């Protein structure tokens, strides 16, 4: 893909000559756009092809490939410009405006022609023989924050790939996105503030240096444990799952067998074991002590090749446990794990408390006959819905459009058996989002058919059909969904939560925080 942008950074007053000189220094520092760009891909990052000052406006012409795309690049300029000129010249940035933005995708002429007449909200689609131009005009900061550009690109790419239709749409007997159940709260929901905005001022969380990570202080931790206890009592124990302790450092071979490496390779944290050579690490330590900075390039030479990932799905060890084993479907297995964090690299998608790279879940995984697997999946979902209704939390359940295990099977020709509905997703309503009715996914209930059975060579000793399923109860998201509807006032919480939480602990007492 190629990106071509005509845009403006709009200041609070006319940009005088001395201010312009300082801003130009920032514009000439291309390192701003290279952060996070892989070595050898620098030409794919944003470039400023031209600029002009006009009163309050800094007019920019920018291009890019797929790394630090032009619309990300213009936003990335705001912070270093303000650090350079804000206090020094008493000037601020009012807005970022994109006057015209052309995103160009390439494809075979036959596929391009199939898009004739395609209408995409917020933009125009122009077709050439081997190109699709997605054209945006008059976008402001608000549209950028709402990710309109990324959504439009994804929409066009999905249309372009219809010949290679996502397997979800082929196997699913109910259209993905269909709402199959919902519940309206009996009380009036008056709290309508993003819980992330209040969490840190209230002292319940503190930002951690890592992207998409938070330090959860005692009050938030108490609420987490309350929900964990409720989910175990109200959902997991009622179905008879046995608790196990799953490893969280997963060998790449396991991920390969799951076909996760085909479906979502960019969504994982890869782990490189260090070389066991103390004298080489001493050089690393010495350089760090002298330079007072971490010598990353030297550290890279001391690491072995990636060998593991941090668990992105939490259920991975279950399938490895049964790798090439003979099982008896008359004695099905039902395990659950709540022993640690799950990790997914959301990249730029990480935001707030609901979209994080590190989160807690109660993960249920089971194996048995197709009938058994479907019954258990339905029960895991039913009890989650019952719990939400006990807490008077407004929710809906819909057919999922992204079962994680199908990402690696865009095309299928090996006779894998799939369920009629691979995934149900239960969402708690987020009342602070006004533009559209949105919810946070708190429970994901999946059936895999024979996907993992085939991948791990698992067989029934009488050669009967064996399926697997998994349900993730997202503790982090249950808590965020709860706070989004009830807020932080303990007295407003339902009695069931108050009893589980007991007395809320105090926040840390610091002079400078919260």
From Swiss-Prot:
Residues that, per the record, bind ATP: 344-346, 355-356, 477
Keywords: Aminoacyl-tRNA synthetase, ATP-binding, Cytoplasm, Ligase, Metal-binding, Nucleotide-binding, Protein biosynthesis, Zinc
UniProt entry tagged with the keyword Zinc: yes
Binding, L-serine: 313, 344, 361-363
One GO cellular component term: cytoplasm
Binding of Zn(2+), residues: 315, 363, 470
Reactions mediated catalytically: tRNA(Ser) + L-serine + ATP = L-seryl-tRNA(Ser) + AMP + diphosphate + H(+); tRNA(Sec) + L-serine + ATP = L-seryl-tRNA(Sec) + AMP + diphosphate + H(+)
Cofactor binding note of this UniProt entry: Binds 1 Zn(2+) ion per subunit. This ion is coordinated with 2 cysteines, 1 glutamate and a water molecule that dissociates from the zinc ion to allow the coordination of the amino group of the serine substrate, which is essential for catalysis.
Cofactor annotation: Zn(2+)
EC assignment: 6.1.1.11
Family assignment from sequence similarity: Belongs to the class-II aminoacyl-tRNA synthetase family. Type-2 seryl-tRNA synthetase subfamily.
Quaternary structure, from the entry: Homodimer.
Function (record text): Catalyzes the attachment of serine to tRNA(Ser). Is also able to aminoacylate tRNA(Sec) with serine, to form the misacylated tRNA L-seryl-tRNA(Sec), which will be further converted into selenocysteinyl-tRNA(Sec).
HAMAP family on file: Ser_tRNA_synth_type2 (MF_01278)
Name this protein carries in UniProt: Type-2 serine--tRNA ligase
Name of the encoding gene: serS
């Amino acid at each position: 893909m190629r990106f071509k942008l005509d845009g403006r950074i709009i200041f609070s007053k006319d940009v005088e000559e001395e201010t312009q000189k300082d801003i130009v220094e920032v514009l000439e520092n291309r390192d701003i756009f290279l952060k996070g760009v892989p070595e050898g891909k620098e030409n794919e990052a944003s470039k400023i092809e031209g600029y002009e000052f006009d009163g309050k406006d800094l007019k920019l012409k920018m291009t890019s490939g797929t790394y630090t795309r032009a619309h990300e690049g213009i936003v990335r300029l705001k912070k270093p410009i303000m650090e350079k000129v804000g206090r020094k010249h008493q000037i601020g940035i009012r807005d970022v405006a994109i006057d015209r933005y052309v995103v160009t995708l390439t494809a075979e002429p036959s596929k391009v022609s199939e898009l004739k007449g395609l209408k995409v909200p917020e933009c125009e689609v122009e077709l050439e023989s081997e190109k699709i131009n997605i054209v945006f005009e008059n976008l402001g900061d608000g549209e950028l924050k709402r990710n309109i550009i990324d959504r439009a690109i994804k929409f066009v790419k999905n249309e372009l790939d219809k010949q290679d239709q996502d397997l979800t749409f082929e196997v699913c007997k109910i259209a993905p996105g269909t709402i199959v159940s919902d519940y309206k709260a009996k009380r009036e929901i008056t709290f309508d503030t993003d819980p992330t905005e209040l969490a840190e001022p209230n002292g319940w969380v503190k930002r951690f240096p890592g992207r998409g990570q938070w330090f959860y202080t005692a009050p938030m931790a108490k609420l987490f444990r309350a929900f964990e206890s409720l989910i175990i009592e109200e959902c997991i124990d009622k179905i008879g799952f046995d608790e196990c302790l799953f490893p969280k450092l997963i060998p790449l071979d396991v991920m390969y067998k799951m076909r996760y490496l085909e479906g979502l390779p960019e969504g994982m944290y890869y782990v490189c074991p260090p070389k066991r050579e103390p004298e080489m690490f001493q050089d690393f330590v010495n350089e760090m002590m002298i330079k007072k900075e971490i010598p990353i390039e030297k550290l890279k030479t001391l690491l072995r090749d990636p060998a593991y990932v941090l668990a992105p799905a939490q259920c991975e060890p279950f399938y490895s446990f049964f790798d090439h084993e003979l099982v008896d479907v008359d004695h099905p297995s039902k395990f659950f794990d709540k022993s640690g964090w799950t990790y997914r690299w959301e990249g730029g998608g990480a935001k707030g408390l609901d979209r994080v790279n590190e989160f807690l879940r109660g993960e249920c995984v089971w194996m048995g006959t197709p009938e058994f697997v479907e019954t258990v999946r339905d029960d895991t979902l039913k009890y989650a819905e019952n719990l939400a209704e006990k807490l008077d939390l407004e929710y809906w359940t819909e057919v999922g459009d992204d079962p994680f295990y199908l990402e690696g099977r865009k095309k299928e020709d090996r006779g894998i058996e799939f369920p009629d509905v691979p995934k149900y997703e239960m969402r708690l309503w987020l009342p602070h989002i006004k533009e559209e009715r949105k919810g946070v996914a708190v429970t994901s209930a999946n059936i895999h058919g024979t996907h993992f059975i085939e991948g791990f060579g698992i067989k029934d000793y009488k050669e009967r059909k064996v399926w697997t399923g998994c349900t993730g109860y997202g503790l982090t998201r249950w808590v965020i969904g709860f706070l989004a509807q009830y807020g932080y006032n303990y007295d407003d919480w339902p009695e069931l939560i108050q009893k589980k939480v007991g007395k809320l602990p105090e926040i840390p007492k610091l002079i400078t925080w919260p």
